[in-house]
Regions:
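Transmembrane alpha-helical segments of polytopic membrane transport and secretion proteins
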Residues: 1-31, 254-274
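Generic hydrophobic transmembrane alpha-helix motif, especially the helices
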Residues: 116-152, 156-160
Length: 274
């Protein structure tokens, strides 16, 4: 038997990986727990007026009440539904347009100045005109989310397509790739890491635009919950809503978007798994 045929057993890494995940979780949670402890100490020590800032117990109690009566679930469902629709529409339009801009110098030259102009407008800047065009409700909020995502994803798609080396395209063409094959086997896989990064960034903008739009243009959603609580001086509801908004985004980003971006870069990008 040759020495090349012998494969020494690899050490089990499941325990090491589990320990690393545990350490990462502790490192992530420690600052949050410290912030909560500091919050409680300040409120108790200085006897802060609950209308100015509530204590931890009041926020927890309010949170449990909104969960039990179904209010929180209703607001979360409305907000997530709007984000899903607005983001999906933006992705469906922005990726083809970004690919077209990346493949055609003429299209890119014509549209790039428009992209630079509109990309500096924050999603919330569209709220006034969105309510004029679509009224108060789903249409206006979806339009705000669409604009928050569209330009980011389109621009990142353009960067991804433009970054594909020309020799790679020529090599694929010399092997007979053209048209649909070139697009699906070379262009899109090469641009995918940038596209996923754009989607991740755009969703962050969409989430912020959503909350702002819901404060003005609807009567259900997490943003509306915060705005309504403000009218009744319910600071405990406001703080709880802010915590929920942050938790939802962290869950989406850490459990869905970040792993997707990492896997995409490892599969089609310029890095390897270590």
């Amino acid at each position: 038997m040759s020495s090349d045929s012998f494969q020494p057993p690899r050490p089990a890494l499941s325990g090491v990986s589990g320990y690393r995940r545990f350490v990462a979780s502790v490192v992530f949670a420690a600052p949050l727990l410290a912030l909560i402890a500091l919050w409680e100490v300040i409120v108790r020590t200085f006897d802060v007026n609950p209308r100015v800032f509530p204590d931890v117990e009041s926020v927890v109690r309010t949170g449990l009440e909104t969960i039990q009566d179904g209010t929180l679930i209703r607001h979360i469902g409305a907000s997530l539904g709007r984000v899903a629709v607005g983001t999906s529409l933006a992705i469906a339009v922005s990726i083809p347009l970004g690919v077209a801009m990346g493949l055609s110098r003429g299209v890119s030259s014509f549209l790039t100045p428009l992209f630079r102009f509109f990309s500096v407008l924050a999603g919330i800047a569209w709220i006034p005109i969105a309510t004029l065009w679509f009224g108060y409700g789903f249409g206006a909020i979806t339009f705000v989310i669409f604009n928050a995502v569209f330009f980011v994803v389109a621009y990142n798609t353009l960067l991804g397509v433009s970054s594909i080396p020309l020799p790679l395209r020529r090599a694929a063409a010399s092997l007979g790739a053209s048209g649909w094959t070139m697009l699906t086997q070379v262009i899109l896989p090469g641009a995918l890491p940038n596209i996923v990064t754009g989607v991740r960034t755009g969703l962050g903008f969409a989430w912020r635009g959503l909350i702002a739009a819901e404060m003005i243009a609807t009567n259900v959603g997490l943003g509306y919950m915060l705005f309504l609580a403000r009218d009744f001086y319910r600071t405990e509801v406001i703080v709880f809503g802010m915590i929920v908004i942050g938790i939802i985004w962290l869950v989406l980003d850490r459990l869905l978007l970040a792993p997707l971006e990492r896997a995409t870069i490892e599969r089609w990008g310029m890095v390897v798994r270590t």
